[in-house]
């Protein structure tokens, strides 16, 4: 599939939308190499997806004994980026920033096997490049309504009183309020009558090591009739996703580039499908990239002025997991 500029992507998406032509799309975090193609051509271009049960391939889990080892970056390396972020937070240039790094992993799974075996509502495998098994919606659109479900806050479900711990944690509360406020503001740029329909509800996610709890909220807005005609503009206006950048978005994104020292690429970008009537899309988190023969699991977390470097480093590593169907 040919990569395009963001302007070409917007024009192509608007064109497909006007024609009500189903299409697949993938946009990287930096908005430098967006991909778009008619849905019917996606598989022959090495793109395989399973998005809320809509898929262009046969999902065939082949249970294998799991051999999955993390090779974490040194804490001192993480601390360098964390200190830079804290300096910017102290100056007031950001008040929430999502800091991410890759962790090298080794195991007996290929990208294809991970795609088939993981359990997630939004899955994508781009041949020889990456696999993504995301729990997080970006936006879903149907019946002229647009929905987003920002996800912020996680805890190990096996901890005593885990749900109450998560819901009453002040740092998690502050982060979640910030992201909900940011996403309300984002939706107001493309829609009207914005409402928070559900605030900080709990999702339970299975992993190969047990269960984790995550908090999300549901935000809703009303789009104009024939929103399909501006589908490219709507997506571009909302990028990057607030939950994986921070607030304020533009300045925070600049700080992210300084702290992480490498481009994220398709990690923390978005992907999705337009089926001719509705749109479903996801934030590309829970993401494993392949570079030559090496595999990297990309993860991160929200940093505020109250964050502790050791805690955040451990959270980054805690998120390096595979949500395997049937795990205890």
Curated annotation (Swiss-Prot):
UniProt record similarity statement: To the C-terminal of para-aminobenzoate synthase component I.
Cross-referenced Pfam families: Chorismate_bind (PF00425)
Name the record gives this protein: Uncharacterized PabA-like protein HI_1170
GO biological process: L-tryptophan biosynthetic process
InterPro entries cross-referenced by the UniProt entry: ADC_synthase, Anth_synth_I-like, Chorismate_C
Alphabetized GO MF terms: 4-amino-4-deoxychorismate synthase activity
């Amino acid at each position: 599939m040919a990569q395009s500029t963001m302007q070409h992507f917007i024009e192509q998406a608007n064109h497909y939308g006007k024609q009500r032509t189903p299409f697949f799309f993938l946009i990287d975090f930096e908005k430098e190499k967006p991909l778009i193609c008619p849905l019917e051509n996606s598989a022959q271009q090495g793109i395989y997806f399973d998005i809320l049960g809509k898929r262009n391939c046969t999902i065939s889990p082949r249970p294998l004994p799991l051999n999955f080892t993390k090779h974490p970056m040194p804490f001192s390396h993480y601390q360098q980026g964390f200190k830079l972020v804290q300096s910017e937070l102290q100056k007031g240039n950001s008040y929430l920033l999502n800091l991410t790094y890759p962790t090298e992993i080794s195991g007996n799974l290929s990208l294809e096997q991970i795609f088939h075996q993981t359990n997630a509502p939004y899955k994508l495998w781009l041949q020889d490049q990456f696999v993504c098994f995301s729990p997080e919606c970006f936006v879903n659109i149907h019946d002229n309504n647009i929905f987003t479900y920002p996800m912020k806050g996680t805890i190990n479900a096996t901890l005593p009183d885990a749900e109450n711990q998560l819901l009453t944690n002040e740092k998690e509360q502050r982060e979640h309020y910030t992201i909900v406020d940011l996403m309300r503001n984002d939706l107001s740029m493309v829609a009207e009558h914005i409402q928070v329909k559900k605030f900080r509800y709990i999702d339970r996610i299975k992993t190969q090591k047990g269960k984790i709890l995550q908090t999300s909220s549901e935000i809703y807005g009303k789009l104009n009739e024939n929103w399909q005609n501006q589908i490219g503009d709507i997506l571009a206006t909302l990028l990057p996703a607030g939950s994986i950048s921070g607030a304020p978005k533009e300045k925070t994104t600049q700080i992210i580039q300084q702290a992480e020292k490498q481009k994220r690429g398709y990690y923390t970008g978005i992907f999705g499908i337009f089926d001719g009537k509705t749109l479903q899309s996801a934030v590309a988190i829970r993401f494993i990239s392949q570079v030559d023969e090496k595999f990297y699991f990309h993860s991160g977390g929200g940093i505020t002025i109250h964050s502790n470097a050791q805690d955040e480093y451990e959270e980054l590593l805690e998120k390096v997991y595979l949500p395997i169907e049937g795990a205890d």
